[in-house]
């Protein structure tokens, strides 16, 4: 081959870049297609629902532009806009003419406009990428994850950063500057945690609370507790056996020929299992109250195996009789026995005292004397690993893995599984093993399973409900974490066509065909039906999650709305709570029906809360998305309001569930013995709810402040025509703000009393909210954002951390208020829109936050109980003194002395007596918390100065230029709550403060 001059390397130099302006839109330019240059959107972008952006002004202009060409182009643009103005003017005339005499053409035009709005393109994942990065980890934050709001919302990020930057009162910053890998090396951290523990222990009421306090404070100080450090190791132990290389045998010539491995496991199981009477009591409780919630095994087959295998000596101690055949099957059923005993124990630990009032089988002394420790999980996993379960899987293996997942998820002592812990590993293992044994196909597809001599007929429906459970658990978990589960629909496509409108009836026919004729067949059919509906709900939520993290392109808005409507209809029609008519002539049957309905109601209530939680997260993501777009495109403002309102409505719906659950309204349809599942679901929903309340409150407060400034400016100019509407808006915003503040304080109190000492995750999150609530009571939740930051005292490490995680740039902090004003579109809402939000409060107006006479569980502390919370530190030095409750200056809400509004501020009474709210009588009759009294719109704002002829300006406090807020109780204390927060790694969001 010969090289010519044209192909020589000398000719491969990069030529000069030509600076030519492109007048077509970006989408057409990238696609290299013709653009009609129509404004504001070209024809191609309009047709394909693409974003149409003309970036002529942003392009680098040529060095020597051609003047004649520029003049010609400008003249062409003038002609274009002149013609467009004429056309629009004519359209306007036609519009008003059509208003007087409606035509079919106008109706068609309106329909077209509505369709165009519904097909508005949405691209959440592509336009809002977020990767949190530290030296030891990286994590992507997706739109439906819990942390998306924290890292995407400017208001919330700023609030959190303002807490972290309070160096003078916060011990977190010094701890970070030093050795952050060992928090106990910081004296300020250790001293505050020790002081916190002493006060909490002193005020604790139950032994379980004292145990949790010691455990949680040890975690804060990073003290190693072997029992708590093996949770991850237990999951890993599924994959290997720490015994020997050989596996368990399935048959043996005689019992004397057992392998050493089998003998060792037999001895361990005999030592682990409690006496006969205790086992029977635990099993009775499990099968009566819990089994139908998690029916991952066949009750009859399990009981038959246990009856054959588990024998007892004269003292009632367990002695195993394994026989010589089917040894592995018997060991697998023993593993199931160990796991369900552990789950039964977990469910009973949620009742603080007087267990005898709820369970006829278990007593408090029995729990204390024969606890089922978490070591049984490790033992069961070791037995499975010794069977080489990956290669020799069966239905029993699936049952064990599913019960292991449940034991981790629902146990508050095993870490925060289902949030960021390795329950992902377990459920994905279950999917792999389930597909390997054909669970993803209906059992009727396999002739071998239907052979009467080769297989047990009871396995057919067991396999069905196992696969439905796997689908539900895997898709719900991935959706809650905002992650993508690979093809969840393909997991069920071979099982049944869920798109068929009659799919439920088809599935029920299959189940009926394979029923065995036992007494429990009717209940089994109902369980299969509600599990099928739960799988449908999980698939809807998974579709919603998958759409929000789709990178392939934009999605029409109506696609998201259709999924929301379908999920809401399913929740409304198939997840309603059931009641039972009491039959005094057949008490036993009535009791059984009550118990079974309680189980179904637990599934329904959990499904409603999870469904509404995912709807709220979707609303949050869309609200933030349209908030950004509306700053550039005015037509998006209506969409922003739509999802802002939806956030308010979904939040109120979730809070309604919280109130009804904790005040005992569900006690007739929901047993306390199944509350461990519902409480876990509420734990998942509380953080998102509380953070959303903060976001709404700050936006509404800023909007009110901006309108107050506008009101003053109108008075100064003498322009009084708009004053009535502005003042009416201020009243409405004030109503919304104060009502949401009440909700935030009540949810905070409920979480403190019922969840703080059950879940370490909530314990740490509420420690952060202790700071927020303290600011809220002072009236500084919003104004505290604008405290001047001394950049000289802020280390580069802290500044970098804030920028990489929260996206806060301290160099631009001087323009913070301008950025927040620019982001706040709430000020543009109309009066009708504000009234619509206020109307939502009617849904919970008459719901009591706590009712001592009607509590779900008398062991749960009521509002009047002196429940130990970190807030007790605020008044630990002032004992036995009356504490005036929080009161609004216009419409006080009487929630009693122990409510959130009445926590201590006595230390500053002498110096701030003139600012104190009026005290409510301290008689016993005033201490019970009645219903919430939300403020009506006409009671929030003083109209005495709202005369349109009055040109006096509204008075603003000096701590914020345009700040106005009704007075809240003063709280100047000798010991700051932020010092306690200083020991935390940001409530388990280790992506913020991770050890180096």
Swiss-Prot record:
SUPFAM superfamilies: Zn2/Cys6 DNA-binding domain. Pfam families: Zn_clus. Residues 25-52 bind DNA. Keywords: Activator, DNA-binding, Metal-binding, Nucleus, Transcription, Transcription regulation, Zinc. InterPro entries: OAF3, Zn2-C6_fun-type_DNA-bd_sf, Zn2Cys6_DnaBD. It is found in: Nucleus. Induction: Autoregulated. Induced upon growth on fatty acids. Its main location: nucleus. A motif (9aaTAD) lies at residues 985-993. GO terms for molecular function: DNA binding; DNA-binding transcription activator activity, RNA polymerase II-specific; DNA-binding transcription factor activity, RNA polymerase II-specific; zinc ion binding. SMART domains: GAL4. The PIP2-OAF1 heterodimer acts as a transcriptional activator to induce the transcription of genes encoding proteins involved in fatty acid beta-oxidation, a response called oleic acid induction, when cells grow on fatty acids as sole carbon source. Recognizes and binds to the oleate response element (ORE) (or peroxisome box), two inverted CGG triplets spaced by 14 to 18 intervening nucleotides, in the promoter region of a number of genes (such as CTA1, FOX1 to FOX3, FAA2, PAS8, PAS10, etc.) for peroxisomal proteins. Activity is inhibited by OAF1 under non-inducing conditions. The 9aaTAD motif (residues 985 to 993) is a transactivation domain present in a large number of yeast and animal transcription factors. Heterodimer of PIP2 and OAF1. This is Peroxisome proliferation transcriptional regulator.
